[in-house]
A protein has these predicted regions:
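Bacterial N-terminal signal peptides that target proteins for export
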Residues: 1-9
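Sec/Tat signal peptide C-region and signal peptidase I cleavage site
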Residues: 18-22
Length: 338
């Protein structure tokens, strides 16, 4: 009898231990409500040092996209969410020659030297897509609106239209419409749990990228209720295998690989808000280094490339456009009691 009691007690201890362990695991459930919009601001800073025939060419690019997401309809684990580009801010500096565009301002400085690029930026603003999201594994399964998007961006430029039709693959569009969903764990996690996610981005005649994210759940952010996930991203480039018909160049060969971050780059971190059921903020930083062999006019040219890139994403229940009116006005403080 005593052995039976000990056995029952042991089983109870195991059951209680399992319960405690399950309770200690953080859950990451996306919370969507039909027609209740939420917003994101995605900013990317890229610095490239390109060496060609012994000469260095430095290019800097800053881009900010303002997104509005509106849940439209649900079918089991799948949601169709409407995505709209509410605003675009771009700044490109090629060896001291700046090009800027800001859709949030009425008066644009213009760019007489590259009006086609300015038109491209303008056409990005207001673009809309219907994104089908599987909430079980956080994968974007489908994006509707590609044909209209490519037609809009390529308007007025045969060369741009040809390039976009080749590089704007279904995979490329899915990843463009997926700034944070792929960073969310697809199950409960305990402190110091680790996991991986892999993606392949195929850009047709530009080549493809294999991306690996290694995640570690670190628990609650100190002093906050946000869940902290640290990320170690890595990327490997593969040269294209298909012909670059209609393009002025062809990437014949190349290798690009991730390297340790520069001292000034921010570490990659995701902060998840369990209350809103969305990512509060995310930072993903990369450094790449390698070389490409580019064929132009039948001549092969070796290009050495070093690139640093940092992308930040911020989420909100209100539009993040400058000067936007909050959907829910702040409540005035109660008068002091007499």
């Amino acid at each position: 009898m005593s052995r039976i009691r000990l056995g029952v007690a042991a089983l109870l201890c195991v059951a209680l231990g399992a319960t405690v362990t399950a309770q200690d695991k953080a859950t990451f459930a996306l919370k969507l409500e039909k027609d209740k919009a939420f917003y994101q601001k995605m900013s990317t800073t890229v610095t490239q040092i390109i060496k060609v025939q012994g000469q260095d060419l430095t290019q800097k690019q800053d881009s900010t996209f303002f997104f509005k997401w509106t849940p439209d309809k649900q079918d089991g684990d799948k949601w169709v969410v409407k995505q709209k580009v509410e605003g675009v801010v771009m700044s490109i500096d090629i060896s001291g020659n700046p090009i800027t565009y800001d859709s949030t301002k009425k008066d644009q400085p213009g760019s007489a030297g590259n009006p086609g690029l300015m038109d491209f930026f303008k056409n990005l603003d207001g673009s809309e897509f219907a994104v089908t999201l599987n909430t079980k594994d956080w994968k974007v399964e489908k994006v509707d609106g590609k044909d209209e998007f490519v037609k809009k961006l390529g308007a007025g430029s045969t060369q741009m239209d040809s390039l976009l039709k080749k590089i704007m693959t279904d995979d490329a569009l899915k990843q463009m419409a997926d700034p944070t969903y792929g960073l969310i764990p697809d199950g409960p996690k305990a402190v110091n749990d680790t996991w991986e996610k892999k993606q392949t981005l195929n850009l047709g005649p530009i080549g493809s990228y294999d991306v690996t994210y290694k995640f570690t759940y670190k628990g609650k952010e100190p002093g906050k209720t946000l869940d902290r996930i640290e990320v170690a991203p890595s990327l490997t480039y593969k040269a294209p295998t298909e012909a670059a018909d209609g393009l002025l160049f062809k990437i014949k060969a190349g290798t690009l690989e991730s390297k340790p971050l520069d001292a000034g780059q921010k570490p990659s971190v995701v902060l998840f808000n369990a209350t809103t059921g969305r990512i509060e903020s995310a930072t993903i930083s990369l450094k790449l280094k390698g070389d490409l062999t580019v064929t132009i006019g039948g001549t092969d040219t070796k290009v050495e490339l070093e690139q640093t890139q940092t992308t930040t994403v911020d989420g909100s229940n209100d539009s993040l456009l400058p000067g936007a009116t909050p959907a829910t006005p702040p409540t005035a403080p109660a008068p002091p009691k007499k």
